[in-house]
Amino acid sequence: MSDGKKTKTTVNIYGQHFTIIGEESKAHMRHVAGVVDDKMREINEKNPYLDINKLAVLTAVNVVHDYMKLQEKYEILERQLKEKE
């Protein structure tokens, strides 16, 4: 959870080091980076001939797709809860 204080950490995503600054904990930022790294490797396994730029874009598209599906499910659950009130 964010407390307003900036945190800086270095992460490794797909063999590249990135410095990330945010309001979340270092553990959270490392976890996020790990999820991105895992997704990139998953996509690369299915199509090893993608260059790094295409791999990064496809990773972003996949992650946003997953996020949007979860958001839709959340909104449905919220509506169901309101209907029960």
From Swiss-Prot:
Record keywords, A-Z: Cell cycle, Cell division, Coiled coil, Cytoplasm, Septation
Superkingdom of the source species: Bacteria
Family annotation (InterPro entries): Bac_CellDiv_Activator (IPR053712), Cell_div_ZapA-like (IPR007838), Cell_div_ZapA-like_sf (IPR036192), Cell_div_ZapA_firmicutes (IPR023688)
Pfam families: ZapA (PF05164)
Signal peptide: none
Similarity comment: family membership: Belongs to the ZapA family. Type 2 subfamily.
HAMAP family: ZapA_type2
Protein name per the record: Cell division protein ZapA
Species, as recorded: Bacillus velezensis (strain DSM 23117 / BGSC 10A6 / LMG 26770 / FZB42)
Gene name of this polypeptide: zapA
